[in-house]
């Protein structure tokens, strides 16, 4: 049985330099949810994050860099005594093209350093997530520039559609659980 979502974590890098970069797809989805609910992020320096309150759920943005996201999420989970399965994580995914989102109940990091940090600090791989496709770099050896780069102007329309789809998937997951949401949103073509 799916655990109810109590905390939604968007992964990204803090600061203006990284706003609207591919690696910050998780932050972008969280910003949309916060706007929908009129929620305002406030700094929680002790737990290294920004937190906003949604309807029965916490929205959390780590204020650490991506590779250290667990330094925020692990302490938040323990402070609020949350089951890891109730911590829903949104992150970028280079293995999917822009336009594709996939929900996953649990699993390995798959090479994503932010997820590796979460697994290390949460002590488990068993937390649901939404993987937000950002596509592969155009050339070999350009991964860092790709994930830290901004979306191109010609990608903006598809980005907006995909952010809306991700927002819908989160809301559906909150109401119906990750299993049912995955059956619907994972079947939708990009």
UniProtKB/Swiss-Prot annotation:
Sites annotated Discriminates between blocked and unblocked aminoacyl-tRNA: 13
A Pfam family assignment: Pept_tRNA_hydro
EC supergroup of this enzyme: hydrolase
Compartmental location: Cytoplasm
Amino acids binding tRNA: 18, 65, 67, 113
GO MF entries: peptidyl-tRNA hydrolase activity; tRNA binding
Positions marked as site (Stabilizes the basic form of H active site to accept a proton): 92
Chief localisation class: cytoplasm
Gene Ontology annotations of biological process type: protein quality control for misfolded or incompletely synthesized proteins; rescue of stalled ribosome
Enzyme Commission (EC) number: 3.1.1.29
Catalytic activity reported: an N-acyl-L-alpha-aminoacyl-tRNA + H2O = an N-acyl-L-amino acid + a tRNA + H(+)
Oligomeric form and interacting partners: Monomer.
Family, as annotated: Belongs to the PTH family.
Name the record gives this protein: Peptidyl-tRNA hydrolase
Gene source species: Akkermansia muciniphila (strain ATCC BAA-835 / DSM 22959 / JCM 33894 / BCRC 81048 / CCUG 64013 / CIP 107961 / Muc)
Gene from which the chain derives: pth
């Amino acid at each position: 049985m799916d655990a109810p979502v109590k905390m939604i974590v968007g992964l990204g890098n803090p600061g203006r330099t990284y706003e609207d970069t591919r690696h910050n797809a998780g932050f972008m989805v969280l910003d949309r949810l916060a706007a929908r609910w009129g929620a305002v992020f406030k700094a929680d320096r002790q737990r290294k994050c920004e937190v906003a309150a949604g309807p029965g759920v916490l929205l959390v943005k780590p204020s650490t860099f991506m590779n250290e996201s667990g330094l925020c999420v692990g302490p938040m989970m323990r402070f609020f005594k949350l089951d890891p399965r109730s911590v829903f994580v949104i992150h970028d995914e280079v293995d999917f093209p822009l336009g594709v989102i996939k929900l996953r109940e649990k699993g390995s990091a798959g090479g994503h350093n932010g997820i590796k940090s979460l697994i290390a600090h949460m002590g488990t791989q068993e937390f649901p997530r939404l993987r937000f496709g950002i596509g592969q770099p155009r050339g070999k050896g350009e991964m860092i520039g790709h994930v830290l780069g901004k979306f191109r102007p010609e990608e903006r329309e598809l980005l907006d559609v995909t952010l809306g789809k991700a927002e819908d998937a989160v809301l559906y997951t909150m109401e119906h659980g990750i299993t049912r949401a995955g059956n619907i949103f994972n079947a939708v073509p990009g």
